[in-house]
From Swiss-Prot:
Lineage: superkingdom: Eukaryota
Organism placement in taxonomy: Eukaryota, Metazoa, Chordata, Craniata, Vertebrata
Disulfide bond sites: none
Name listed for the protein in its UniProt record: Exocyst complex component 1-like
SMART domains (UniProt xref): Sec3-PIP2_bind
Any single Pfam family the record assigns to this protein: Sec3-PIP2_bind
Source organism per UniProt: Homo sapiens
Length: 172
């Protein structure tokens, strides 16, 4: 489903603006409409973060840009609590925007993409706080192009270790 939405977003919104869509996540912003937080790169190699409203008119899917920022203006991404599995995060521009991703995995996918594009295009000191750095940095053994599967894989690894440890007899 998400690949179809991504194709539709690219075709109807980003390609006409001569931008490449790198990542999008669904965010909880309104009860009536769906919203996406998108990361794109322009032909001039400017990284943009865009909030898009998705709605339907009849059978036609429509997308409307509601907010647009430059990655250059982003000061910090705050994941709220690194130790808990929650979808909440803040984007710190001149103003702080508190957002809720559809899932914790999509929050991490967004932060990973922003971090990767920052290193590729801006190389500025972008603060990414209250995230587990193992899942954010590409130099980690857990980094992957599977994005949302990354967090699930790590959780399964820890669960397997716990099962193995619980089955080991304790010496008396």
């Amino acid at each position: 489903m998400s690949s179809l939405v991504k194709e539709d977003l690219e075709k109807k919104l980003f390609k006409p603006l001569s931008q490449n869509l790198y990542e999008f996540i669904e965010i909880e912003f309104s009860v009536q409409d769906r919203y996406y937080l998108c990361v794109s790169v322009t032909k001039k190699e400017e990284v943009k973060i865009v909030m898009v409203k998705h709605y339907r008119i009849g059978l036609d899917e429509k997308y409307e840009v509601t907010k647009k920022w430059s990655l250059n203006d982003l000061q910090m991404i705050d994941g709220k609590e690194a130790d808990t599995d929650n979808p909440f995060f803040d984007l710190h521009f001149k103003k702080v925007y508190s957002l809720e991703a559809y899932s914790c995995a999509s929050k991490y996918a967004f932060a990973r993409t922003v971090n990767k594009l920052n290193h590729a295009y801006l190389k500025k000191d972008l603060q990414i706080v209250n995230f587990d750095s193992t899942y954010i940095n590409d130099d980690s053994i857990w980094s992957s192009n599977n994005k949302d599967c990354l967090v699930l894989m790590r959780i399964c690894f820890y669960a397997f270790n716990l099962v193995c440890l619980s089955l080991c007899p304790l010496p008396l």
